[in-house]
C-alpha cells in the first residue's frame, strides 16, 4: 500500500500533528505570485450556497480555509469539520475556536460517514481524495449525505504542480524519488466524480511560486510523504537552490491547482 493511502501512516506520522502541513501551507502563503489568495478563490465558489447552508468538510486539516476566510462566513452557516487525524482536528479547533459559530469538529473516515441521508447542502474535500483508499466508497457516502440539490467541492493538483521541485528531487536522488502519480488529479478526477455526480465542472487557479528562502524549500521537501532523501542529497539540493537564488534572485516553481464542483 502506498503511504499516500495508508491510514496508519497518515494518522500516526504524516498528519499526527500539524507540523508537516504547516510547513507546506507557509511556503504557498509567502511565495505564491497570485495575490488574490487560494483560499479566497475557493471560497468564491461557495457564493450560490444558501444563507443557512449546512456544510460538511472532509479532511479539514488545520481549518485553514475557514481561518483565512473568517469574515466571509455567513452567520447562519452550520459547519461540520471532520478529519481522520486527532492531531489535525486539535489544530483546527485551536485555529477556529475564537470564531464562536458553533462549528462541530468530529473524527470521520470519508469511506464511512456517520450522518443521515440528505443532511448537507455542500461537501468539501480539498487536497485529500488522493489519500482515500476506496474513493468509490467515499463518493457514494458523500453523495448519500448530500441533499438532492447538494454540491461537492473538491480541490486537487494537476500534472504540472511543483514540477520543477520534483525534477530537482529526481535528479539528486538518482531517480529514486520524483513526482508521484496521484490517484485523484485535475486530469483524472472528473471521470471519477462523474460515476456519482451527473454534472462536474473544473476551474483552475493560475499561480506559481517565486521562492527566496532556501531553508523553507528544504523544509517543504523534508515534510513530504513521498520523498526520503539522505543528508548528502539534501545538501546537494541546498547548494543548487542557493546558486539559483544568487543567479536569478528567486527559485521559480510551477503550480497547477484547481477545484471540481460536482452537482447532484
What function would you assign to each model-found segment?
Residues 136-148:
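A short glycine-rich, Lys/Arg-flanked "PGG" loop and its adjoining helix->strand segment in the class I
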Residues 121-134:
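A short SAM/SAH-binding and catalytic strip from SAM-dependent methyltransferases
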Residues 3-4, 28, 35, 62-64, ...:
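Conserved Class I S-adenosyl-L-methionine
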Residues 174-188, 226-227:
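Acceptor-substrate binding/catalytic loop of class I
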Residues 54-112:
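Class I SAM-dependent methyltransferase SAM/SAH-binding core
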Residues 1-50, 64-68, 151-180:
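Conserved class I S-adenosyl-L-methionine
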Residues 111-122:
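A short acidic, Gly/Pro-enriched loop at the edge of an enzyme's catalytic core
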